[in-house]
């Protein structure tokens, strides 16, 4: 066995495997926590939304550990790791899933919304993995990071989301090589549309709805969160390098160079003026922050703004 072909310690067949999941209060994270429980694992739930996180923990079981933390703060993620080790003694898997979206064209998008998207989606992944890394090395564990289909398909008016997810994929490609010598596996999740609060809140933007309407049928399809969770947990068990949702996404990934050729962008180019006009209507009605975030993230941002005053 060469240095480039490391053997990894198996973990999924053990009587106990501890899986830390960020963004676990809802959507993909919540569904994954339930699936981990169904497969006999021990989920640790992390989110910055305290009330829905506590409710989700009760659904997983009365003794389920949950930690209210903002992934953009490295110290907070170190505390999550310390609390997990105090309760469970180990961390076998980390699913860096927490994410938000910003929506709006370059000329009008709220800069704070754009920045927040990058902070959560990029630095949040870094902080999560960095904090848990010593524990993962101890267990020869596995990391899965959520890059989404937007890591290689970059729609207009979602530049922050696309840029952040492209960064996540790049981080994963680098880290996979770095961590192999430490017997830690790393996978990147490339998921299309999943019925989650993030997607539901996006549908409140007429411009977002128009954007999705430009996409051909297969690219506009949605998976349910439970179906997504089954694919994700199966990927964890296999220590997969990449997890595809749906499976045909791997074909699109292989053809990624074609996605931004002129012929492929033609329909988006035609729709772009209408998408921008719809965005501006929302901007006039609600302001830049409201148009750039869904209601959940907007409320979080407003709360943080009040706390700073």
Label each PLM-derived region with a short phrase:
Residues 25-26:
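Conserved glycine-rich cofactor-binding loop
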Residues 39-55:
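Conserved glycine-rich Rossmann-like NAD(P)H-binding loop of the short-chain dehydrogenase/reductase
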Residues 68-79, 111:
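The beta1-alpha1 cofactor-binding region of Rossmann-like NAD(H)/NADP(H)-dependent oxidoreductases
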Residues 105-106, 110-115:
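Substrate-binding pocket helix/loop in short-chain dehydrogenase/reductase
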Residues 129, 164:
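Active-site helix of classical SDR
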Residues 148:
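Residue(s) in the substrate-gating loop at a strand-loop-helix junction
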Residues 181-249:
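SDR active-site lid
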């Amino acid at each position: 066995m060469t240095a480039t072909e490391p053997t990894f310690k198996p973990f999924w067949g053990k009587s106990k495997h501890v899986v830390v999941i960020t963004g676990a209060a809802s959507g993909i994270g919540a569904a994954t926590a339930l699936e981990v429980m169904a497969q006999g694992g021990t989920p640790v739930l992390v989110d910055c939304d305290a009330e829905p996180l506590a409710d989700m923990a009760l659904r997983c079981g009365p003794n389920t550990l949950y930690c209210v933390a903002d992934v953009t703060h490295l110290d907070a993620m170190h505390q999550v790791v310390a609390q997990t080790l105090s309760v469970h003694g180990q961390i076998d898997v980390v699913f860096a899933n927490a994410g938000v979206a910003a929506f709006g064209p370059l000329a009008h998008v709220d800069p704070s919304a754009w920045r927040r998207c990058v902070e959560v989606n990029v630095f949040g992944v870094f902080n999560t993995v960095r904090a848990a890394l010593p524990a993962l090395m101890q267990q020869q564990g596995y990391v899965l990071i959520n890059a989404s289909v937007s890591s290689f398909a970059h729609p207009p008016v979602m530049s922050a989301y696309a840029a952040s997810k492209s960064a996540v994929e790049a981080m994963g490609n680098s880290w996979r090589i770095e961590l192999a010598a430490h017997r830690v596996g790393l996978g990147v999740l490339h998921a299309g549309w999943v019925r989650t609060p993030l997607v539901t809140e996006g549908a409140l933007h007429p411009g977002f709805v128009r954007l999705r309407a430009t996409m051909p049928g297969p690219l506009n399809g949605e998976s349910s969160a439970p179906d997504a969770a089954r694919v994700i947990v199966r990927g964890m068990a296999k220590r997969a390098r990449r997890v595809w949702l749906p499976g045909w996404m791997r074909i699109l990934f292989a053809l990624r160079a074609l996605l931004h050729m002129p012929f492929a962008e033609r329909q988006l180019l035609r729709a772009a003026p209408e998408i921008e006009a719809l965005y501006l209507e929302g901007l006039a009605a609600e302001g830049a922050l409201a148009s750039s975030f869904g209601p959940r993230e907007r409320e979080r941002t407003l709360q943080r703004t009040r706390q700073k005053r």
